[in-house]
């Protein structure tokens, strides 16, 4: 299983070469839109564990990515939302209602 990390600052320890780090909402939207199309064309592709950070630097945040994930579902085993931001509950509830296995988590060990 590959991991997709959407975070403007952090990199987790133990990431594999196939894992993906996205630093802002624009790169996350591009990545997830391509993945959504690929999954729609070839059902059953590799599942991803997705880690989301709310604050992506400056005025950028994860909300537009969450909206996209609700409208264009991604086949994934888990979505983990870093629990250091007050909007975490909204993100988890929104994704859970859309069918994702979403939960609040502490930050994994950083690299």
Task: Kindly give the residue locations of the regions a language model identified.
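Catalytic phosphate/metal-binding cores of nucleic-acid and nucleotide-processing enzymes, i.e., regions
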Residues: 1-111
